[in-house]
Amino acid sequence: VPANRADRFGGRDSALAAVPAAGNRREFPMPAHLKFFYGPMDCGKSTLALQMDHNHARQGRSGLILTRYDRSGGALVTTRVGLSHDAIEVTDELNLCGLVRQHWALGRRVDYLIVDEAGFLNPEHVDQLAELVDEYHVDVYCFGLATDFRSQLLPGAKRLMELADAICEIQVEVLCWCGLPGRHNARVIGGRITREGDTVLVADTVATGGHDVRYQVLCRAHYRRGELGQPTLGEQLTLD
């Protein structure tokens, strides 16, 4: 155990010193990684996050699933293909290093973190994720939007792009109504694109709950022009 890590946990004989942080990595350290998978709405980010968790869990690894501002409004990772999984909601006050240490204190392994909606993290959260990777050998896989409805980098996404070991654009292509690749997440209120308002306004690609608010993926040209096209059957699909 590195001396600074043992000291941080209260010495080599503390309860935490006996808990494997990431399998046998504490005895045989291996590099961990911070990876950011990004793409527009509807490209399958949350589905990929749950698949990643499944792949690691089936190999005997133990992880935590986290989210921030899921479309469900709860502490869940949900997908448009009907999959869902309980998750830990990342609040402004939550220290992610402290969260992992709490699990170690209870004798629970934490080999990896799955973080959905990571674009909405605070920069401080991302710094904590980097610390978990570098100092404690915990793998971190983040999934989220890169830009907001103004087509500006989200704070968490910006910091992830600055710190991540790998930045991966999800290859499922989402199309604008014109058929070109869509990369811009337009916020639509009352049938019109809006470019004003809070950065975070939880809604889906189909207006629900009596609120006339939704998001639509557009190509750059139609995003700039504010052109939504004619309503089509495709707008009613709920594929993630």
Model segments located where?
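Extreme N-terminal basic, low-complexity initiation segments
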Residues: 2-8
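Short, Lys/Arg-enriched N-terminal segments with co-localized hydrophobic residues
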Residues: 8-29
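Conserved P-loop NTPase "ATPase switch" module shared by AAA+ and STAND
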Residues: 108-121
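Conserved P-loop
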Residues: 26-103, 148-159, 201-202, 209-239
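Residue-level signature of catalytic and energy-coupling elements of molecular machines
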Residues: 49, 116, 164
